[in-house]
């Protein structure tokens, strides 16, 4: 979870469906999943265990296996800030040096190079539908950014949205 890494805390994004989203206002239901933030792994594990009902998650144990980490530099890597590049380099160094782990570089298959655009269209399309009530009842209270996202999403044809969902599903299966 990006915010956790930026703030120096622990974040965990579980698999889709691990934690029920009942009662949550979702912006993009096919992309959103609930996770947890905390000051340490044990706190996050306890939170996810409580929210999911998977109480085994609360039993954090030390792993004695060396970590295996993969670095995937997508076509968007060229836009990464120097701070982001430095953080990735530091994480790689730490995994290799301190944890004696194996870090591999992997390439994104060419057929997945459009995932960022696909994800963006899915998100915008779903935002447009998810915020229909707010747009109809409280349009003047919505920020310019949200209004713009709603408008962009409304302009995406359902046929394109469905194609994007299919491509995202194919990509998940490839990974």
Model region roles, listed by residue range:
Residues 66-68, 121-172:
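Short helix-loop capping/hinge segments that flank enzyme active sites or metal/cofactor-binding pockets
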Residues 1-48:
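Short glycine/serine-rich loop segments
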Residues 6-9, 113, 117-123:
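Short low-complexity, flexible loop/linker segments enriched in glycine and/or proline
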Residues 55-58, 171-175:
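A generic local structural motif
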Residues 31-34, 77-78, 85, 154, ...:
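Active-site oxyanion-binding pockets that recognize sulfate/phosphate
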Residues 43-46, 87-90, 163-170, 174:
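A non-catalytic, amphipathic alpha-helix used as a structural packing/dimerization or gating element
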Residues 33, 50-119:
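Gly/Ser-rich, acidic/histidine-flanked active-site/gating loops
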Residues 17, 24, 36-42, 49-57, ...:
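Generic secondary-structure signature for well-ordered alpha-helical cores
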């Amino acid at each position: 979870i990006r915010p956790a890494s930026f703030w120096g805390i622990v974040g965990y994004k579980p698999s889709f469906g691990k934690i029920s989203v009942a009662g949550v206002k979702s912006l993009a239901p096919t992309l959103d999943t609930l996770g947890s933030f905390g000051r340490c792994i044990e706190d996050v594990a306890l939170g996810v265990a409580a929210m999911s009902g998977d109480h085994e998650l609360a039993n954090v144990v030390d792993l004695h296996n060396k970590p295996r980490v993969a670095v995937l530099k997508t076509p968007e890597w060229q836009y990464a800030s120097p701070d982001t590049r430095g953080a990735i380099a530091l994480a790689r160094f730490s995994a290799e040096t301190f944890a004696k782990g194996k870090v591999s570089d992997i390439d994104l298959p060419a057929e997945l190079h459009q995932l960022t655009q696909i994800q963006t269209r899915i998100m915008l399309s779903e935002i447009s539908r998810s915020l229909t009530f707010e747009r109809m009842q409280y349009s003047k209270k919505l920020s310019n950014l949200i209004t713009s996202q709603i408008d962009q999403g409304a302009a995406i044809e359902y046929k394109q949205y469905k194609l994007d969902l299919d491509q995202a599903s194919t990509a998940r299966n490839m990974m």
